From Swiss-Prot:
It is an enzyme of class 2 (transferase). The modification N-acetylalanine is found at residue 2. It comes from the Eukaryota. GO terms for biological process: protein ubiquitination. Pathway: Protein modification; protein ubiquitination. Its EC number is 2.3.2.27. It catalyses: S-ubiquitinyl-[E2 ubiquitin-conjugating enzyme]-L-cysteine + [acceptor protein]-L-lysine = [E2 ubiquitin-conjugating enzyme]-L-cysteine + N(6)-ubiquitinyl-[acceptor protein]-L-lysine. InterPro entries: RNF121/RNF175, Znf_RING, Znf_RING/FYVE/PHD. It comes from Mus musculus. This is E3 ubiquitin ligase Rnf121. The lineage of its organism: Eukaryota, Metazoa, Chordata, Craniata, Vertebrata.
Amino acid sequence: MAAVVEVEVGGGALAERELDEVDMSDLSPEEQWRVEHARMHAKHRGHEAMHAEMVLILIATLVVAQLLLVQWKQRHPRSYNMVTLFQMWVVPLYFTVKLHWWRFLVIWIFFSAVTAFVTFRATRKPLVQTTPRLVYKWFLLIYKISYATGIVGYMAVMFTLFGLNLLFKIKPEDAMDFGISLLFYGLYYGVLERDFAEMCADYMASTIGFYSESGMPTKHLSDSVCAVCGQQIFVDVNEEGIIENTYRLSCNHVFHEFCIRGWCIVGKKQTCPYCKEKVDLKRMFSNPWERPHVMYGQLLDWLRYLVAWQPVIIGLVQGISYILGLE
């Protein structure tokens, strides 16, 4: 039977010694958390001025880092995107190993292995004809899974806040942990796959020759050829396809459904792959059930900074505080 512990913050050094003498093995997890919380308060008592300095350092570092990142992205977008992608891929792995999140580690290894294979196929020259569709189908699949996972996680969190978890006799902390975990999985892999898809989209499109980041395309586009994958289009725009339909943009260029969805939604491209005319996503995806996918993609872009750069900035702040002797 776990002992009942009353934790009171106060009493100076005597109270701190009493907290150090508490046997944590006899306490429940909640009581252990209370003791650790009281120890932290006792340790940092009287450090208000020091804590104010640390807050100022944090604010200043965040402002300076944000300005530097914006300038870097504007002046050297390619290197910024590559470093951000590497940060997105590696930083969570450190916390996974440190905190023993083995389930996340298994999923991360599987995702990394398949994505590495797909990326390898996308960067080969000459490009195999089936590679573009393979790449876009894989990333579109991950995009839909991450989208659904994020929605389920968000609903679980909201149900917990409204107390609906009690109808199923589920503890609030268990329901909240489940919802937050699903939300994290959906958002993290949603951001990561979009960055990989954008990189592969640029490389494949420039290799095929119908697209170039700067300048004119190196090949002339036929009316019956998809500029994303370079394959023949057999289904008319007005016909209903068995596997996929054919889409026509406002510039009158036609594409395979999976290709243009991968290019615009997953690959984050807002222009025609051939003529670079602005793409009207609302017109192309007229079904109202498809529009949340576009808004979800914009949400993932906002979260990229939080996942990739926030841990680095926090680590930098901790390093500055350590050098200055702040605790």
